[in-house]
């Protein structure tokens, strides 16, 4: 098997005991499987939950707290205990664990986005295991990833991972709830995630986590948009992850062979950069952007909204108000209003670097309906 870069996400339900606390036996089982993958020559990045589970007991809570303040306090205590457990377990196999705590704002800045990529790449080159969790102690609702499922998809995307493995306590996706319908049939393979599947999955997670099957499907669809194949399922023992990569996993494989991966710059534009404004284009420009792979020129712009600057990211909508894409502009809003609808040669004097394009094709991302929201 060729060397692969794999992102493994372990949720709270796969790390906890019946009372909701951290289960060290479960944690060691995951570590042993990751260590075995690394011994086979693969790069592995671990996305882990479990900080709240590790911290609520030592903090004096009888059960997992339900308030935001309680969860954040438990996470503040539990994150160091969680990393201590991982570091100790990986050391038994000769591997060094590295902690990275992220918030949504770490992805907004392109410079921080690049620095994160460089840091993780350097850790992998030196044989370490990057262990990533959301910084639950400081994250506020507006800045969170929603759950670590989505965080794992975003990390898998910008690292150009070959596979995203979402480990859970259910062995894959079914056409009905297997806990209530004994006739439910499991999907061994799915080429894509549809709106109907997400709707049917509901939104309720386990008592010890914030996710659920719906969040995993949303994360899987995001990963697929980056060109990353996905596995959702379960397993135990040293070879469970190796078996998943070999196509023998107990779960559902999602995606197509050899998907086209999205460039890191375009990932940042599409999913992470703050959107500073909106440009409306005519039908000719829409067709050029979507069907002919062209750049957006001033002549095709009919309206400009927002107070954006050159090199900001803006949404592009058609004449019906439907978002068709997102891109980095060479014109400030005030200048673009002056030159909209005019030929490029007349407009370029107002452009950053005197470019003829409003948005160059290299700085453009077409957005499908399901990819518009962050």
UniProtKB/Swiss-Prot annotation:
<keyword id="KW-0418">Kinase</keyword>
<dbReference type="InterPro" id="IPR036393">
    <property type="entry name" value="AceGlu_kinase-like_sf"/>
</dbReference>
<feature type="binding site">
    <location>
        <position position="136"/>
    </location>
    <ligand>
        <name>substrate</name>
    </ligand>
</feature>
<keyword id="KW-0963">Cytoplasm</keyword>
<dbReference type="InterPro" id="IPR015947">
    <property type="entry name" value="PUA-like_sf"/>
</dbReference>
<feature type="binding site">
    <location>
        <begin position="210"/>
        <end position="216"/>
    </location>
    <ligand>
        <name>ATP</name>
    </ligand>
</feature>
<keyword id="KW-0067">ATP-binding</keyword>
<dbReference type="InterPro" id="IPR005715">
    <property type="entry name" value="Glu_5kinase/COase_Synthase"/>
</dbReference>
<dbReference type="GO" id="GO:0005524">
    <property type="term" value="F:ATP binding"/>
</dbReference>
<comment type="similarity">
    <text>Belongs to the glutamate 5-kinase family.</text>
</comment>
<dbReference type="InterPro" id="IPR019797">
    <property type="entry name" value="Glutamate_5-kinase_CS"/>
</dbReference>
<keyword id="KW-0028">Amino-acid biosynthesis</keyword>
<protein>
    <recommendedName>
        <fullName>Glutamate 5-kinase</fullName>
        <ecNumber>2.7.2.11</ecNumber>
    </recommendedName>
</protein>
<dbReference type="GO" id="GO:0055129">
    <property type="term" value="P:L-proline biosynthetic process"/>
</dbReference>
<dbReference type="Pfam" id="PF01472">
    <property type="entry name" value="PUA"/>
</dbReference>
<keyword id="KW-0808">Transferase</keyword>
<dbReference type="GO" id="GO:0003723">
    <property type="term" value="F:RNA binding"/>
</dbReference>
<comment type="function">
    <text>Catalyzes the transfer of a phosphate group to glutamate to form L-glutamate 5-phosphate.</text>
</comment>
<dbReference type="InterPro" id="IPR036974">
    <property type="entry name" value="PUA_sf"/>
</dbReference>
<feature type="binding site">
    <location>
        <begin position="168"/>
        <end position="169"/>
    </location>
    <ligand>
        <name>ATP</name>
    </ligand>
</feature>
<comment type="pathway">
    <text>Amino-acid biosynthesis; L-proline biosynthesis; L-glutamate 5-semialdehyde from L-glutamate: step 1/2.</text>
</comment>
<dbReference type="GO" id="GO:0004349">
    <property type="term" value="F:glutamate 5-kinase activity"/>
</dbReference>
<dbReference type="InterPro" id="IPR001048">
    <property type="entry name" value="Asp/Glu/Uridylate_kinase"/>
</dbReference>
<feature type="binding site">
    <location>
        <position position="148"/>
    </location>
    <ligand>
        <name>substrate</name>
    </ligand>
</feature>
<feature type="binding site">
    <location>
        <position position="9"/>
    </location>
    <ligand>
        <name>ATP</name>
    </ligand>
</feature>
<dbReference type="InterPro" id="IPR001057">
    <property type="entry name" value="Glu/AcGlu_kinase"/>
</dbReference>
<keyword id="KW-0641">Proline biosynthesis</keyword>
<dbReference type="InterPro" id="IPR002478">
    <property type="entry name" value="PUA"/>
</dbReference>
<dbReference type="InterPro" id="IPR011529">
    <property type="entry name" value="Glu_5kinase"/>
</dbReference>
<feature type="binding site">
    <location>
        <position position="49"/>
    </location>
    <ligand>
        <name>substrate</name>
    </ligand>
</feature>
<dbReference type="Pfam" id="PF00696">
    <property type="entry name" value="AA_kinase"/>
</dbReference>
<dbReference type="GO" id="GO:0005829">
    <property type="term" value="C:cytosol"/>
</dbReference>
<keyword id="KW-0547">Nucleotide-binding</keyword>
<feature type="domain" description="PUA">
    <location>
        <begin position="276"/>
        <end position="354"/>
    </location>
</feature>
<dbReference type="InterPro" id="IPR041739">
    <property type="entry name" value="G5K_ProB"/>
</dbReference>
